[in-house]
């Protein structure tokens, strides 16, 4: 079984990083896609822990901006060739996982935007380049693709609806994914169930975080969920998203990360 988890870590501070590590190291997923990483001490501490545990860590540099990292407990081959054409390559990470058959995982952290023209154009450029990247993938690789992360967009049929908030090019992301043959794992597994992965100050829910799979993987979907614990425990402000694919993974390849030691108390 190949299991994948994606989570926006909210540019974790060093103070939050240990608690976040305890949660992540307790998870069974072999691939962790972390979005909104940063160049700060918190992200560095978190990723260094997994490196010391023998995990493979892919974290493209993106000075002064927020990015994406992939942590793998099973062997992977980094694929910077896939992300090179993106308008902001450091906002994505890609690797091919050594499963049977091989699976390519692409994690993205789509830029957020308000109505400031520069931010709108930055987001539009990224989504346009993502569409081009998907279109340029070989057909077989796209069929064995897992795309996931924080898309910073909701679907047209999202509940609650937020009329006037999203621009047509933002909604069009999901048309792009459908045209690429990618299936929303959650919608496939639990049709008609609305989940939320981020909540605004007024308590309004938004589904920003997703996992999509290619046509050859759709029938291998075995399970998945939205996990609210990271948000409820204030480890970050997002829920995690998981999926399980019924694919062969050599058990000898799995590398368990050591537990994070609880801080000592005075009494």
Locations of regions flagged by a protein language model:
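Structured beta-strand-rich core segments of catalytic domains in phosphoester-bond hydrolases
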Residues: 31, 36-115
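Surface polyanion/phosphate-binding segment centered on an Asp-His-Pro turn
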Residues: 227-267
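Active-site beta-strand/loop signature of hydrolases that rely on acidic residues for catalysis
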Residues: 4-8, 23-42, 105, 130, ...
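Short, surface-exposed, charged loop/turn segments at secondary-structure junctions
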Residues: 120-123, 151-174
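Active site of divalent-metal-dependent phosphoester/diester hydrolases
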Residues: 56-72, 168-218, 231-234
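Active-site beta-strand termini and strand-to-loop segments that position acidic
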Residues: 72-74, 95-100, 203, 214-215, ...
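N-terminal, active-site-proximal structural segment of metallo-dependent hydrolase catalytic domains
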Residues: 1-49, 68, 158, 252-267
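Surface-exposed cleft-lining segments at the edges of enzyme active sites
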Residues: 83, 110-128, 158-162
């Amino acid at each position: 079984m190949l299991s994948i988890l994606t989570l926006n870590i909210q540019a974790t501070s060093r103070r939050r990083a240990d608690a976040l590590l305890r949660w992540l190291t307790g998870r069974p997923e072999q691939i962790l896609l972390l979005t909104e990483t940063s160049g700060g001490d918190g992200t560095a501490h978190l990723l260094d822990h997994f490196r010391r545990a023998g995990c493979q860590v892919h974290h493209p540099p993106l000075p002064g901006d927020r990015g994406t990292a992939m942590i793998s407990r099973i062997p992977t081959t980094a694929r910077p060739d896939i992300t090179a054409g993106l308008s902001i390559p450091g906002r994505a990470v890609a690797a091919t996982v050594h499963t049977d058959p091989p699976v390519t995982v692409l994690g993205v952290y789509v830029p957020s935007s308000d109505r400031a023209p520069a931010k709108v154009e930055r987001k539009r450029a990224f989504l346009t380049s993502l569409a081009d990247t998907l279109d340029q993938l070989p057909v077989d690789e796209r069929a064995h693709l897992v795309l996931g992360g924080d898309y910073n967009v909701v679907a047209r049929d999202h509940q609650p609806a937020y009329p006037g908030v999203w621009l047509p090019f933002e909604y069009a992301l999901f048309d792009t994914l459908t045209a690429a043959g990618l299936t929303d794992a959650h919608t496939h597994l639990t049709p008609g169930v609305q989940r939320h992965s981020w909540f605004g100050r007024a308590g309004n829910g938004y589904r920003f975080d997703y996992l999509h799979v290619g046509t050859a993987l759709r029938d291998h979907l075995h399970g998945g969920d939205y996990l609210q614990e990271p948000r409820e425990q204030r480890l970050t402000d997002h829920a995690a998203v998981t999926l399980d694919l019924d694919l062969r993974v050599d058990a000898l390849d799995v590398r368990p990360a050591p537990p994070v030691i609880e801080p000592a108390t005075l009494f």
